[in-house]
Amino acid sequence: MDLDQKLSTGELRVDGDMTIYRANEVAQTLFASVRAHAGDVNLDLSDVTEFDTAGLQLVLMARRMVESNGHRLDVVRPSECVAEVLELCNVAVTTEPTQAAA
């Protein structure tokens, strides 16, 4: 899993797998990045290739961390596998790319 950080603009881009098999690795990197940024976060998951409920839990935990500081985390440009899990679990954490950029 790679995490491209553009924290000056509040954008984090994750690629690769976000599954139970990589949950610890993803969590450490993602949460450290979220803690380092004191503002709204756009989490770009367009290059995520596998996503399961462990990945969903990581996204929800990251969102809770950001919201506890009075800010917002949005998933932008979810890949197909991410969108499928979000829809299946009836979870709304996405924002249209045009809304996220505004």
Predicted segment positions?
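STAS-like cytosolic regulatory interaction modules
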Residues: 1-51, 60-102
